[in-house]
């Protein structure tokens, strides 16, 4: 009885608190942006305009002429991001183009109840409808519910006067389908950090708009579960990802700006601050990169691919020092720069001490971070080389094509470009880093990829990697060693091993 009373009291307090936390538009305009944010926003919009198809009312995939047969030539999610940017800019013709795009995006939502993909969207209009029992991510992407849904919510909060009532009604209905579909699919966990944060905001937004008390109660419990999991170690389960940390920051900014209660806003602000400090501790401004280890990574050099953390940092750093490459249609993962309108509206809130670390290297330091009960990340951040390792208590392996890289090294080569090493394949693994290098424990086959301009394959042997600007001494018990060329890199494989030490020394 006491427990029921306590739960009821918490819910009552949550509902009462909703009246204390008003959600108001930020009224951001290009003129009100600071220089760096405005430059980023303009680059994003210029690329959108370059790739927009006025007949289809969607943006083309960058490089679509070479990839269309494999992935489709249009991007539904990213088109919704362009629409938000158009409404923000509000130049002549922007409102109509945004309305056309939003109409086209909404037509790509799966609206048949009772299927697992209900409420999500086609990734491209060329994508066939799922049939039978499709494999998640291949047959459909459930996360488009949240990437697109949160964008629609931002439009409805910020620019209700710039769209028609009919379009607004359709957008609210689309958000409801997304929430209903996610609830019924039941696949999402609070540990799936970036999606869990977006879902928490979107669920709260829909609950308040619909005056749905069940959703209000459930969304409040969801946000608390995400926060509670984070606070165990002040870390997200998807740890240290230059792309998905950027989505985490987006979700947290939605909480702190648009959360319907002071509680949501407060815990969103708290987690956002902690996350920025964590990012800053791994960042080396001389190398313009966040060190590994990476739980999920699409690249190893933020000077050559677009990471969403890099997009965030570009809003407060000049182009010449931000961890972001020049923006062109050919830039790796360039579509993520289309996240810029969201960031421009929400604003970048980096704690002052963390911001200083992003501008000036403050000295060599060791990092040791508990992620979960089983997982610990370690890294050595020095002036000329950064490297990290993740110990998993032998609970995680690294499969072919994995985004998980539990051992990484980055440095600047004599050419001026970033060189890197990433562990790309391993059985259950533990890796730890300190100022001397990386120690690895894994029984079986371990593979690394090494990339560095002017790398000579003949200078890479089992016991020593003589790389441009870096020397790594290897102490291992492997039974076999092999090396092969892989595009602009080399793959090296140690088979039949149990332990290995990489002794890392920058060549001055």
What spans do the regions from the language model cover?
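Bacterial N-terminal signal peptides that target proteins for export
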Residues: 1-7
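Bacterial N-terminal signal peptides
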Residues: 8-15
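Ser/Thr/Asn(+Pro)-rich, low-complexity disordered segments
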Residues: 23-147, 151-160, 166-183, 319-508
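Alpha-helix boundary/capping and short turn/kink residues
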Residues: 91-92, 161, 212, 261
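Extracellular polysaccharide-recognition and catalytic grooves
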Residues: 154, 169-355
């Amino acid at each position: 009885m006491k427990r029921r009373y306590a739960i009821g009291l918490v819910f009552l307090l949550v509902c009462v608190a909703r009246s204390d936390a008003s959600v108001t538009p930020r009224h951001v305009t290009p003129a009100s942006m600071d220089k760096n944010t405005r430059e980023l926003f303009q680059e994003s919009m210029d690329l959108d305009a370059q790739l927009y198809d006025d007949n289809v009312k969607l943006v083309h995939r960058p490089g679509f002429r070479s990839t269309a047969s494999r992935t489709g030539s249009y991007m539904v999610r990213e088109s919704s991001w362009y629409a938000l940017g158009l409404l923000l800019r509000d130049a002549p013709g922007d409102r109509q183009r945004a309305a056309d795009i939003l109409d086209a995006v909404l037509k790509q939502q799966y609206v048949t109840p009772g299927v697992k993909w209900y409420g999500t969207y086609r990734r491209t209009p060329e994508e066939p409808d799922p049939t039978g029992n499709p494999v998640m991510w291949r047959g459909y992407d459930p996360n488009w519910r949240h990437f697109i849904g949160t964008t629609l919510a931002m439009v409805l909060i910020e620019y209700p006067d710039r769209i028609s009532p009919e379009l607004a009604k359709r957008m609210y209905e689309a958000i409801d389908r997304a929430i209903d579909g996610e609830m019924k699919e039941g696949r999402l966990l609070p540990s799936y950090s970036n999606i869990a944060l977006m879902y928490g905001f979107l669920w709260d937004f829909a609950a308040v708009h619909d005056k749905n008390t069940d959703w209000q109660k459930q969304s409040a419990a969801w946000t608390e579960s995400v926060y509670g999991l984070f606070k165990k170690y002040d870390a997200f389960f998807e740890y240290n990802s230059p792309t998905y940390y950027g989505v985490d920051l987006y979700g947290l900014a939605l909480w702190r700006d648009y959360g319907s209660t002071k509680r949501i806003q407060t815990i969103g602000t708290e987690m956002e601050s902690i996350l920025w400090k964590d990012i800053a501790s791994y960042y080396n401004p001389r190398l313009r990169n966040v060190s590994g280890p990476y739980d999920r990574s699409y690249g190893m050099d933020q000077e050559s691919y677009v990471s969403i953390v890099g997009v965030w940092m570009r809003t407060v750093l000049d182009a010449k020092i931000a961890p972001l490459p020049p923006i062109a249609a050919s830039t790796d993962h360039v579509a993520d720069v289309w996240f810029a309108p969201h960031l421009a509206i929400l604003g970048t809130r980096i704690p002052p001490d963390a911001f200083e670390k992003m501008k000036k290297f403050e000295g060599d330091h060791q990092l040791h971070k508990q992620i979960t009960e089983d997982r610990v990340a370690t890294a050595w951040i020095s002036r000329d080389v950064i490297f990290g390792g993740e110990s998993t208590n032998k609970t995680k392996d690294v499969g072919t094509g994995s985004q998980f890289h539990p051992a990484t090294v980055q440095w600047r080569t004599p050419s001026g470009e970033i060189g890197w090493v990433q562990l790309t394949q391993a059985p259950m693994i533990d890796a730890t880093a300190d100022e001397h290098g990386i120690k690895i424990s894994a029984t079986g086959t371990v593979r690394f990829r090494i990339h560095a301009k002017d790398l000579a394959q003949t200078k890479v042997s089992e016991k020593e990697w003589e790389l441009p600007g870096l020397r790594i001494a290897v102490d291992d018990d492997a039974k076999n060693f092999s090396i092969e060329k892989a595009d602009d890199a080399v793959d090296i494989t140690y088979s039949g091993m149990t332990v290995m030490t990489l002794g890392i020394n920058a060549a001055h």
